Every structure is written in structure tokens, then in C-alpha cells.
Amino acid sequence: MSNSAKSPSGPVGDEGRRNYPMSAHTLVTQEQVWAATAKCAKKIAEDYRSFKLTTDNPLYLLCVLKGSFIFTADLARFLADEGVPVKVEFICASSYGTGVETSGQVRMLLDVRDSVENRHILIVEDIVDSAITLQYLMRFMLAKKPASLKTVVLLDKPSGRKVEVLVDYPVITIPHAFVIGYGMDYAESYRELRDICVLKKEYYEKPESKV
């Protein structure tokens, strides 16, 4: 008996995998993301054990909006499985407009609400390509005098670097490609896709939008 069903993303087949018309191919499945994130969470838990984290002195996960919101939620749960107390804060900065190339100019759109002075901060990014935004955020947060500051990145694209930045916890390294899904978008679309997919060039190279 088939378990096929209809969804806004298209038909779901017997393997539960959606067919994405805008996708050239699936780069990383949701299950692969979970496995890699769980492994990363174990490493983070080991590294922070000496910090004596508690509910009063938690690890602050600084979710960089909008792309890392799903990754942050999953990471928080995997860290909880490892016994790491966390608190989630949100920040938003961007060097992208609606295109696929960085503008090189970072705009701060949302700052953290609480003081993070003397707190342990882990910046959570969905993807690092040029590293311009991450470099900006690290400098911005260091000015707030945290007790420690590290970075975790779901997708690391070293080939796209324009500035040198240390990524403490790169979860998955990928080649140069424009990716969507699992929180990541093109022109605010496709964040809801379960898998991480390579966007077809025709969707962002033609003047007429297919979004």
C-alpha cells in the first residue's frame, strides 16, 4: 500500500522524500543533517564541560536569522540530549539582498535583547561562504564582552572565503553551490524544504522569477 500524499512542495513518495521542482539535486538530506548535528553536539558538550554550565550560567545559542532558525532548534535539542543547558537569543545581520552574491556591506537588522556580558556565546549560522557577515558578527559580539565566543556553522563553503574567519564547529563542508531548504532561502522562498537542495540556475539567472 502506498503512503503517497500531497503537500505544497509536491508529492511525497514511498520513501517519504519530496520532489522539489526547483531543485537541481538534493545535496544533504534532513536525516544526514540530524546525524551530523548530533555528532557536533557531542563535540560541543565535551568542549564546554570544563565551563561548568548550569541553568543560571547556560550556553547562549545566538541564532542568526533568518536562515539558521531550524538548525538552531535542532542543535538546541541535541545539546539538551547531551546535558548542556542552553538559552536561545536572536540576531539578524545580512550582506545579501535578494540575489545570490554578497554585497560586501553588512547591515545589522536585529540585536540581542539581553546582556551577554560574561556569558558563553555560540554563534549559530546556517552557512558561511564569504565569511563577511560572520566576521562582522564576531567583532560585534566581542564588543559586548562575553566570557567566551565560538561559532558553529551548519554548511561551510571554504572555497567562497573573502575574509579569514575561524569556524570552531563546521558541521558539514560543501562545494560551491547556491543552496536552499532547511531554513535557507532564495528571495524568502524555500525555507520550508526538509532537505538541503541545490537551486536550479534557471530560478535565479532568468529575469522572470519562478519564485
From Swiss-Prot:
Q: What is this protein called?
A: Hypoxanthine-guanine phosphoribosyltransferase
Indicate the enzyme's highest-level EC class.
transferase
Family matches, as Pfam families:
Pribosyltran
The cross-references to InterPro entries, in alphabetical order and at most eight, read: HGPRT, Hxn_phspho_trans, PRibTrfase_dom, PRTase-like
Which prosthetic group or cofactor does it need?
Mg(2+)
- Any one GO molecular function term: nucleotide binding
Is Cytoplasm there in the keyword field?
yes
Reaction equation(s) it catalyzes = IMP + diphosphate = hypoxanthine + 5-phospho-alpha-D-ribose 1-diphosphate; GMP + diphosphate = guanine + 5-phospho-alpha-D-ribose 1-diphosphate
| Record: residues binding Mg(2+) | D185
What is the disulfide pattern of this chain? none
Regarding protein family, the annotation reads: Belongs to the purine/pyrimidine phosphoribosyltransferase family.
**Which compartments does it reside in?**
Cytoplasm
Annotated GMP binding lies at K66, E125, D126, I127, V128, D129, S130, A131, I132, T133, K157, D185
**Biological or metabolic pathway of the protein:** Purine metabolism; IMP biosynthesis via salvage pathway; IMP from hypoxanthine: step 1/1
Organism (species): Leishmania donovani
Q: How is the cofactor bound?
A: Binds 2 magnesium ions per subunit. The magnesium ions are essentially bound to the substrate and have few direct interactions with the protein.
Catalytic center at which residues?
D129 (proton acceptor)
Q: Which UniProt keywords apply?
A: Cytoplasm, Glycosyltransferase, Magnesium, Metal-binding, Nucleotide-binding, Purine salvage, Transferase
